[in-house]
């Protein structure tokens, strides 16, 4: 059982990231309110390192399956971080050659509106309508119905980072584990990144014990069964 002090200091979101990452960038109000104020309930979590994201996944699994047991339901597969390959597959939304999750190579729609929360130019944090993070689902989803696979906050993946993982991973279900590698894969780009980092094929990393105001995560789960049988007909 983890001690309360350890959980509070190591696994809860670090609210000081807003001041540490961007001094005077509205840091004090966000540091005070982002994690706890109901006005931010629909915003993505930030300030969590890789370990904290994994701990939350385990915590979520435990409580979900306890609720299932209390209601006479079967346990679910565990929540976890997606592998880098899973994340990219999800981001592409079924479009193998998609530059961005919305499918096309363009950053604006026909009306000239940006298609994600990111920084289109030097110092330009405002053109997308949001100065920093945005509430989830403010932009259109990809063809899998997934929101914010590009921009808003970058996302932790399960994999350790290597400059080229192809020679060292199994091609059927590639994931790269290395407990001695402190760098972990981060994907998707964020509100403070330029368009390059929003690309579905763009790779990046952060150190596993680092919490940032522009990195969050989403959970994945093994799906039992298949979506349809049409591909076998």
Model-identified regions with their sequence ranges:
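Short beta-strand-to-coil "C-cap" segments at the C-terminal boundary of structured domains/repeats
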Residues: 219-226
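Functional-site microenvironments in short loops/helix caps that host divalent-cation chemistry
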Residues: 5-204, 211-213, 228-233
